Amino acid sequence: MSSGKILPRRQAVPVLYTRGTHYEVGFDMGRTFGSMIKNFLILSKPLNETYLPLYQSPKGRQIYNETLGSVKDSFPQYVRELEGVADGAEVEFHKLFLLHLDEILPQALKHQPRSKNQPTGCSTIIVNQKNCRLLGHTEDALTETLNHYYFVVAHIISDKPQGKYNVKEEHFMSLCYAGHLPGYTMSHNHHGLVFSINTISAELLRSGKTPRHFITRALLATSNVDDAFRVLKDAGVGAADACSINFTFLADPRQMCYNVEMAPSPDRKNESHLNIKEVPLGEHNYHVNQFDRIRQDQANDLMISSSISRMQTFGAYNPPMSEQDVRHMLGDVSGGVYCVWRENNSCDEVVKTIAVGIFDLSARTISLYSDNPSETEPHCRLPLLYK
């Protein structure tokens, strides 16, 4: 029985290994973590206080249906995957899809105030040196998400090509929030893709377009840099909302890393608006939860204040050159209310850092932390999938 209670930080990193069709993999996620998913649906304030009431209105239902229809046209396999999660967990599908719509519904209805008026987000550090290639990432979220996440290692083989990119096989590992599809946090796949996501709260959102969570889910199937850019561009539809993607491919002969800022098209083009930054060998990069290069209005002042504070914290350090440097920076608590590592050891804190992952691109491993990486050792260090 789900209690709807927020627990103190657990020293645990759940990992599920599963294989099958999209529906079967989703069902396994739902069945395995059903109690966690049900609990999260009880606790989620944005879902219960904003998304569900708006969904009950005629206009809200219209926006929900047109966006679901758009996703079904492009990525029917991922809708089946989410249906599997709902069936396995024995929860209602529309609640899970509303979580994936995030702020699209309230923004399309000009609902005020926007529910996500909290400094949620995450921080990513890329180190691309000859002798040290790392991608480190904090996953920060509303406190109800604490202890409501898991890693999924999935191998999906379809009997015929799936979706707009005709994908037949996927093999990946991804951190998932309870009830969410893989791909919108930190992930890697068997083609050597490694990536992390920074949420950006754009003022301009588009209903009937592709929610960022489904674009990054499709990113999990990509096999090279051009393929990744094609998925992010989402020609014919385009992104409904905004985020930043930090990524590289292990086999890239250039050893190039990238940060891509993705936003809805300001010109109503049927494709995403992208700004691509290369991070070549010998360089490093930081990204948090604001546009650094795209010139679009942003909706969440607290998220912007938090982003500015975290970037100032990173800027006070010498450029990172080692895994220890990255651990110290991602565990930094010097920024006051908007520090990098967020934990005040009480359940009344609005936002917490729920997990940290550090990808070692040279050793081809990921180190997973559920607590401050500057003070603790990783729970585990897992080999990256690679063909």
Curated annotation (Swiss-Prot):
Documented effect of changing residue 122 to A: Impairs self-processing. Does not affect homodimerization of the unprocessed form. Loss of carcinine hydrolysis
Per the record, pH dependence is: Optimum pH is 6-8.
According to its UniProt record, this protein's enzyme class is hydrolase
Q: What is the effect of changing residue 121 to M/V?
A: Impairs self-processing
Some GO term, biological process aspect, for this entry: which one? cuticle pigmentation
Molecular-function GO term, any one = beta-alanyl-histamine hydrolase activity
| E.C. numbers | 3.5.1.-
What does the annotation give as the result of altering residue 121 to A? Reduces self-processing
The yes or no answer to whether the keyword Nucleus is present is: no
Q: Tell me if tRNA processing is a UniProt keyword of this record.
A: no
Where does the UniProt annotation locate this protein?
A: Cell projection, Axon; Cytoplasm
Task: Tell me the outcome of changing residue 256 to I.
Answer: In tan5; reduces stability resulting in rapid protein degradation. 4-fold increase in affinity for carcinine. No effect on self-processing
The reaction(s) annotated as catalysed by this protein in its Swiss-Prot or TrEMBL entry are: carcinine + H2O = histamine + beta-alanine; beta-alanyl-dopamine + H2O = dopamine + beta-alanine
Cellular component annotations (GO), alphabetically ordered: axon; cytoplasm; cytosol
Q: Which UniProt keywords apply?
A: Autocatalytic cleavage, Catecholamine metabolism, Cell projection, Cytoplasm, Hydrolase
User: Could you give the subunit structure recorded for this chain?
Assistant: The unprocessed protein forms homodimers. May form heterodimers composed of a 15 kDa alpha subunit and a 30 kDa beta subunit.
PANTHER family, A to Z: BETA-ALANYL-DOPAMINE_CARCININE HYDROLASE (PTHR34180:SF1), PEPTIDASE C45 (PTHR34180)
Q: What family is this protein classified in?
A: Belongs to the peptidase C45 family.
Q: What is this protein called?
A: Beta-alanyl-dopamine/carcinine hydrolase
Please state the gene responsible for encoding this protein: t
